[in-house]
Amino acid sequence: MSKKAIVIYNSKRGSTKQYAEWIAGELGCTSVPLENLDYGSLGQFDVVIFGSWLRGSGIVGFDKFRKQIADCADKLIIFVTGISEYNPQNYQQICEINFKDGINMQNTLLYFCPGRYVPSEVKGLDKFLMAISKKVLISGATDNESSAAASTMVDAIENGVDNVDKRYTEQVLRAARK
């Protein structure tokens, strides 16, 4: 028996949308931009997949989404895109910032899919925040391991990076098919 799924996404520059379309294509379901979502329709789905991008470990658009989906929390799978290196500390920080109340992190699956960053496309607040991030990274690295990670991130901020790869959808697809 096949589960009925929906993929909801919030994408600013295309990475999250690309992953959402790949996931929806593999599951044979629809992908819907968050701004076009009919929250009343979520009850008909066995699996609700939400994807968005990270800004300072915050899942952009998730606050609004979370308030509307209390009845679907047990069917929720989340994927996030970003350019920072995935590690347990980043995962923990994402959880602490985004799962304070309403959704129990114990029952929610969260996956990281590496994203894309093109400096010339970044404007306004995002450009300002990336400049601050760069300064913090440069001044905050205290040991060789954190220094290497900071250097990699600074390079991505200055020169851009594209780590989008369909293989990162496999973890989300496995969870959706369980």
Residue ranges, per PLM feature:
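N-terminal beta1-alpha1-beta2 submodule of the flavodoxin-like/Rossmannoid cofactor-binding fold
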Residues: 1-72, 170-178
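FMN-binding flavodoxin-like domain, especially the glycine-rich phosphate-binding loop
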Residues: 26, 57-178
